[in-house]
Regions:
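Long, low-complexity intrinsically disordered regions
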Residues: 1-317
């Protein structure tokens, strides 16, 4: 395989080949095929598809999240993405930047939750010197659990006017990064609408809690490799290192290589990981039947295999 062939395969899978997604059915099918994607391209570039690129059908002059407000295409793509959130066909995670959502397909989300989410999701977080949550984040969680789904604007009103939007954004980010809460809708008049994840998607959370880290990581590694076609192992470890220890990624890759579920492929002189292709079973073509015709005996000739009858005149002697 050459670099050009690899890039072409990715463009087709990531819908950058002039075939944009415009309907909710197309958007759902795209996300299920790739597993996960960013909403907008990231700088420095990250080897993962983007929803805006699939919506436009090209990677030419795609807007970043900082410039999305000036691009009418971004508003249309966001509207389609929010419909996926409402239908629970996609879930949004705060993996890289709160303004650039990481979208995860419904089928892949339980595995992602097993790596990132809380194992006891209904237990309210507590503030403290050793806690990962601020006091404001704990207050916001209790409010969302009590009154959610609830908009950020409404939250500020209930928590008190002294709470600024930047401070509230930070608190929501703390909860979101651990998948305590999730963005479920967006209203132009009120902004983002939030709910606790265990109530919004109870089945997905329950399944994720029941998965082991190794099982979840193995499934996501396979899905990611299917998405990118082939990737150098170092780049694979960098990507997954954003949400799990790289040593665990390396161990999972070695286990998949030992099981021959992954293998190496040479791409323009570089050694890359890929999902091991299925062996093509060659079935030999059946031999044509040889039809043999039975010859009719000539007149007066005896058929083959029959002995001539004895003359009764001689047998009586």
């Amino acid at each position: 395989m050459t670099d050009l062939e690899l890039q072409q395969l990715r463009r087709e899978k990531w819908r950058l080949d002039g075939k944009p997604i415009r309907t909710i059915e197309q958007a759902r099918a795209f996300l299920e095929e790739v597993g996960f994607c960013l909403m907008y391209p990231k700088r420095p570039a990250l080897l993962v598809p983007t929803f805006i690129g699939a919506f436009i059908g090209s990677d030419d002059r795609l807007p970043s999240w900082q410039h999305a407000f000036k691009d009418p295409r971004a508003a249309e793509a966001t509207e389609l993405m929010v419909r996926l959130l409402r239908d629970r066909a996609a879930f949004e995670a705060n993996l890289f930047d709160e303004n650039n959502g990481f979208l995860v397909a419904a089928s892949a989300f339980p595995y992602f939750y097993a790596l990132v989410g809380e194992r006891n999701p209904k237990q309210a977080p507590k503030a403290g010197s050793r806690s990962a949550y601020s006091a404001l984040a704990c207050d916001a969680f209790e409010l969302i659990a009590r009154q959610g789904p609830i908009s950020k604007q409404k939250m500020q009103e209930v928590l008190g006017g002294s709470v600024s939007f930047p401070a509230l954004d930070g608190a929501l980010g703390e909860l979101w990064s651990k998948l305590r809460i999730t963005r479920v809708d967006y209203k132009a008049s009120e902004g983002s609408v939030w709910d606790v994840l265990y109530r919004w998607a109870p089945d997905a959370v329950k399944e994720g809690v029941g998965l082991s880290v190794q099982e979840a990581l193995t499934a996501l590694l396979s899905k990611y490799l299917d998405c990118v076609i082939a990737i150098e192992q170092a780049d694979l470890e960098i990507f997954f290192g954003n949400f799990i220890a790289r040593s665990k990624v390396k161990d999972a890759v070695n286990a998949l290589l030992a099981a021959r579920e992954l293998s190496f492929v040479h791409v323009s002189g570089r050694s890359m990981l890929q999902i091991t292709p299925e062996k093509v079973v060659v079935v030999p073509a059946p031999r044509p039947e040889v039809v043999t015709r039975e010859r009719r005996p000539r007149t007066g000739a005896r058929p083959r295999g029959l002995k001539p009858a004895k003359n009764p005149r001689f047998t009586q002697r």
